Curated annotation (Swiss-Prot):
One of its GO terms (cellular component) is mRNA cleavage and polyadenylation specificity factor complex. InterPro entries: Fip1_dom, Pre-mRNA_3'-end_processing_reg. Residues 90-104 have a biased composition (Polar residues). Residues 29-58 have a biased composition (Basic and acidic residues). GO terms for biological process: mRNA processing. Residues 8-21, 62-81 have a biased composition (Acidic residues). Residues 292-307 have a biased composition (Low complexity). The gene is FIP1. This is Pre-mRNA polyadenylation factor FIP1. It is found in: Nucleus. Keywords: mRNA processing, Nucleus. Coiled coil: none annotated. Belongs to the FIP1 family.
């Protein structure tokens, strides 16, 4: 019994062999677990390292691409050439004309010979040949109707009556709706009354001649007669001051100014005492009227003018009329 107790005490105090074997197995388990954990750690670290390396490789590749792009940009920038002025003469020929220029291109011909293209451009100015196409005498039209005959009251829209509208945008020269209507009526009336062809026909027919001048009395009614004089125009011709504008001067008309060679007309007798008549050369002196051959002597005419005074009627030998009698 004593031996068992001692063994138990020794086992308790120092442990038994089984106990010594059991911790060894635990240590082995711990070492195995530690080995496994180390393997896991090594795997995780290896995975992390691989991820880091991949990231680094991606960053390096992106940096390399950026570097390549920058190098390409720099290379492309180096390839840029700045050319100032014309580097080569142009093959095209431009023909221009002097005078007012016109930007219209009339003809462009391309000549393809041997692969060379020479463009020939011809610029012809027709502005000098063409006159103005604006007729100042024509009346403007609105919807196919003369503007002076348009009734403003029949228009659907009257924008000049809108609030805030500027009337000068629709009527020029200070006109408004009412004054323009009056102006159009007056213009239509004047155009209807003034007909150049009708006026010319009246002048040629003698209807617009001067009023007759009383030159004498004939008959018992003492009506004045209009006798043609040397200075009056013939029938059917307008008087001197009433010639229409633009009518050419007709030759052979008596009393018309501006007739050339009036003094050199043949078979014109030398009329004495005519003012502004040039002296006719190689004309003999006219003898006295009383001593002209083959002419009877003219009787002495009474001197009526010697007894007259300024402002007094000459005495022709006719007794004066009797004084009026006072009638009571």
């Amino acid at each position: 019994m004593a031996g068992k107790h001692s063994d138990d005490e020794d086992a308790y105090l120092y442990g038994s062999d089984d106990d010594n074997d059991q911790p060894v197995s635990k240590k082995q388990k711990i070492t195995e677990q530690s080995d496994e954990s180390q393997e896991k750690l090594s795997k995780t670290t290896a995975a992390k390292k691989s991820e880091v390396e991949e990231k680094d490789s991606l960053e390096n590749s992106s940096n390399d691409e950026d570097d390549n792009d920058s190098e390409e940009d720099s290379d492309s920038d180096d390839d840029i050439e700045f050319v100032i002025g014309e580097s080569a003469p142009k093959s095209g020929q431009t023909i221009t004309t002097s005078g007012p220029q016109n930007d219209t291109i009339d003809a462009v011909t391309d000549m393809d010979a041997g692969g060379d293209k020479n463009a020939t451009t011809t610029i012809v100015s027709n502005q000098a040949d063409k006159g103005s196409s604006i007729d100042i005498n024509s009346v403007a039209q609105l919807d196919g109707k003369p503007l002076t005959q348009v009734d403003l009251e029949k228009l659907k829209d009257k924008p000049w009556r809108f609030p805030g509208a500027d009337i000068s945008d629709y009527f020029n020269y200070g006109f408004d709706e009412f004054t323009w209507t009056a102006y159009c009526c007056k213009q239509d009336k004047l155009r209807g009354e003034f007909n150049p062809q009708k006026l010319m026909a009246q002048l040629m027919s003698g209807g617009a001649g001067p009023p007759p001048m009383p030159s004498g009395k004939s008959g018992s009614n003492n009506t004045p007669t209009n006798k043609p004089t040397a200075m009056s125009p013939p029938m059917g011709m307008p008087p001197m001051g009433m010639m229409p504008p633009g009518m050419p001067m007709m030759p052979g008309m008596p009393g018309m100014p501006g007739m050339p060679n009036m003094s050199n007309m043949p078979n014109m007798p030398n009329m004495p005492n005519m003012p502004n008549m040039p002296n006719m050369p190689n004309m003999p002196n006219m003898p006295n009227m009383n001593n002209m051959p083959n002419m009877p002597n003219m009787p002495n005419m009474p001197n009526f003018m010697n007894n007259s005074r300024p402002g007094q009627v000459p005495n022709f030998g006719i007794p004066p009329p009797p004084p009026p009698q006072n009638r009571r």
